[in-house]
């Protein structure tokens, strides 16, 4: 979402730079808002309606006491963007029967097959038993792709490599996996023509009676997402939408807005290529991140999940901050995924102020430090004072680094140890237990 954040980040900086808001300033900011929305590929009619609504509120509403007009303008922008992208009501995905059958639809190139595996992985994490069914008889690689992904995430798979009848494959697949909690059925994304594709998915829909029909749309299509959604809606009900590739384009904003306009509910967004990179789409959190307000809730939840698992919080609270605890912290940070994704959640536009080079260097340092710590004995990890020059040389050799690298890491550790009281307070404030 970096591209989208950059577009709106410039707008937010401009708003924060004004000292007061008169008619001329408001008109100028209105044009900037329109430019940002158009760059995000939001449909023109929605851009106009959005701007009119925001300007009307700024003119008619009085900011609460103590709130500067520019801050209130940001608040209005935030609220109107949330409305534009679907409103405050967070989406839900709760299987209500067994098996709960999910039918995935989408055109070729939307990332549908990968999304099937991502959704399965997310549901497995929530404790559901999930199976995957491949019905694509047009694209030969689809069978192997989904089977391999199913093996990677450890879920049952059904498909027929040489099958010709997608409808029968779907029916047999659901029957074979009927003892699971959720069965996700992947369908073809291309056919002889659009009509044939839509007729096939309609026939599969009638054969397996899915509990939820999910349309997968590529974010790069921008405002054209509405046309895709409406084309499928003419043939069968669309219960929810997943927008993929949100990490690679600013046009994702337009795709989200266009889908919301059709009345369909965006439930998930794909934010990377890995099977773990599918997120529940919550408009207010999404908008906060795009505007540079951050999504500390999401960041804290992810950190808490990892650090609680490793019992790092308890160890720091007890005042125990040896190299063993330091190693657990590094392992925990690396479990969060790429640091670029973690930094995107920071507030106040901090992510934009951290260069790609700095993030990459931080990622490399974490991996280097983990290698260094892994080369130490348990005794050394628990008692860092044992680390003399001879031991440091041995550790450096085992980790494939220089003794200087080891000493630099130990300096970072000592600094962190001195900051442990502050860190302890932060953990208590941000991660209530």
Swiss-Prot record:
GO terms for biological process: SRP-dependent cotranslational protein targeting to membrane. GTP binds at residues 106-113, 186-190, 244-247. One of its GO terms (cellular component) is signal recognition particle. It catalyses: GTP + H2O = GDP + phosphate + H(+). Keywords: Cytoplasm, GTP-binding, Hydrolase, Nucleotide-binding, Ribonucleoprotein, RNA-binding, Signal recognition particle. Gene3D superfamilies: P-loop containing nucleotide triphosphate hydrolases (3.40.50.300), Signal recognition particle SRP54, nucleotide-binding domain (1.20.120.140), Signal recognition particle, SRP54 subunit, M-domain (1.10.260.30). It is an enzyme of class 3 (hydrolase). It is found in: Cytoplasm. Composed of three domains: the N-terminal N domain, which is responsible for interactions with the ribosome, the central G domain, which binds GTP, and the C-terminal M domain, which binds the RNA and the signal sequence of the RNC. HAMAP family: SRP54. Part of the signal recognition particle protein translocation system, which is composed of SRP and FtsY. Archaeal SRP consists of a 7S RNA molecule of 300 nucleotides and two protein subunits: SRP54 and SRP19. Belongs to the GTP-binding SRP family. SRP54 subfamily. This is Signal recognition particle 54 kDa protein. It comes from Pyrobaculum neutrophilum (strain DSM 2338 / JCM 9278 / NBRC 100436 / V24Sta) (Thermoproteus neutrophilus). The gene is srp54.
């Amino acid at each position: 979402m970096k591209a989208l954040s950059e577009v709106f980040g410039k707008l937010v900086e401009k708003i924060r730079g004004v000292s007061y808001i008169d008619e001329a300033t408001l008109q100028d900011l209105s044009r900037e808002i329109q430019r940002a929305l158009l760059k995000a590929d939001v449909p023109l009619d929605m851009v106009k309606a959005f701007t009119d609504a925001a300007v009307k509120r700024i003119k008619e509403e009085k900011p609460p006491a103590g709130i500067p007009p520019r801050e209130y303008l940001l608040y209005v922008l935030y609220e109107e963007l949330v409305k534009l992208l679907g409103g405050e009501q967070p989406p839900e995905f709760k299987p209500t029967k067994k098996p709960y059958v999910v039918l995935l639809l989408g055109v070729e190139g939307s990332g549908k097959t990968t999304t099937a595996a991502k959704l399965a992985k997310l549901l497995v994490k929530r404790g559901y038993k999930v199976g995957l069914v491949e019905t694509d008889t047009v694209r030969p690689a689809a069978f192997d792709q989904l089977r391999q992904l199913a093996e990677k995430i450890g879920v049952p798979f059904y498909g027929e490599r040489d099958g010709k009848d997608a409808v029968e494959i779907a029916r047999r697949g659901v029957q074979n996996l009927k003892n699971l909690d959720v069965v996700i059925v992947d369908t073809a994304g291309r056919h002889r023509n659009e009509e044939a594709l839509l007729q096939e998915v309609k026939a599969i829909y009638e054969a397996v009676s899915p509990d939820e029909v999910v349309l997968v749309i590529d974010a790069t299509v921008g405002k054209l997402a509405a046309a895709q959604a409406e084309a499928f809606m003419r043939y069968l009900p669309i219960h929810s939408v997943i927008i993929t590739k949100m990490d690679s384009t600013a046009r994702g904003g337009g795709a989200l807005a266009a889908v919301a306009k059709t009345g369909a509910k965006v439930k998930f967004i794909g934010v990377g290529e890995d099977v773990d990179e599918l997120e529940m789409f919550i408009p207010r959190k999404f908008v906060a991140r795009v505007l540079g307000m951050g999504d500390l809730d999401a960041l804290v939840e992810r950190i808490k999940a990892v650090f609680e698992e490793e019992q790092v919080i308890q160890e720091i609270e007890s005042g125990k901050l040896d190299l063993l605890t330091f190693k657990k912290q590094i392992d925990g940070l690396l479990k969060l995924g790429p640091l670029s994704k973690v930094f995107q959640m920071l507030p106040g536009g901090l992510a934009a102020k951290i260069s790609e080079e700095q993030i990459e260097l931080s990622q490399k340092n974490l991996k280097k430090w983990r290698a260094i710590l892994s080369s130490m004995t348990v005794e050394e990890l628990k008692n860092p004072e044992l680390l003399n020059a001879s031991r440091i040389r041995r550790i450096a050799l085992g980790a494939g680094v220089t003794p200087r690298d080891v000493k630099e890491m130990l300096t970072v550790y000592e600094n962190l140890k001195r900051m442990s009281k502050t860190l302890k307070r932060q953990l208590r404030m941000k991660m209530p237990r």
